[in-house]
Amino acid sequence: MITGIQITKANNEALLNSFWLLDDEKAELRCVCAKAGYAEDQIVPASELGQIEYREIPLEVQPTVRVEGGQHLNVNVLRRETLEDAVKHPEKYPQLTIRVSGYAVRFNSLTPEQQRDVITRTFTESL
């Protein structure tokens, strides 16, 4: 379980009033903010901070890990004829933008091989 804490007493003066996320299971702390000596998001073993006292800070959201399986879907709403015409006459389609592997790209900036690959993968005869 993750607990938000504010350090109220420590041998290291820079730790006073700093905020951390404490992971009891891993015995680690993630720095939220500190005066000096620790960077934001730095993860340290609990033992590194030495003897400390703290007060718990309520967290609004409990972090969770969720694995979806790594699938994604690119949607291009175009006709095959439009892309084929863009290959033959790129000057007619200077603003044609498509989605490729999660990012947007101008169709005319792709190499001819990449353009053919997009057309082949986007328009199939059957599943």
Swiss-Prot record:
Tell me which InterPro entries the record gives. Auton_GlycylRad_Cofactor, Form_AcTrfase_GR_CS, Gly_radical, Glycyl_radical_cofactor_GrcA
Gene3D superfamilies the UniProt entry points to: 3.20.70.20
- Which keywords does UniProt give here? Organic radical
Task: Tell me which SUPFAM superfamilies the record gives.
Answer: PFL-like glycyl radical enzymes
PTM-bearing positions, type Glycine radical: G102
Q: Which GO terms describe its cellular component?
A: cytosol
Residues of the Glycine radical domain: 5-127
**Pfam families, per the entry:** Gly_radical
Q: Which GO terms describe its molecular function?
A: formate C-acetyltransferase activity
The superkingdom of the source organism is Bacteria
Q: Matching PANTHER family, A to Z? A: FORMATE ACETYLTRANSFERASE, FORMATE ACETYLTRANSFERASE 1
What role does this protein play? Acts as a radical domain for damaged PFL and possibly other radical proteins.
Q: What is this protein called?
A: Autonomous glycyl radical cofactor
Q: Which organism is it from?
A: Yersinia enterocolitica serotype O:8 / biotype 1B (strain NCTC 13174 / 8081)
Upper taxonomic lineage: Bacteria, Pseudomonadati, Pseudomonadota, Gammaproteobacteria, Enterobacterales
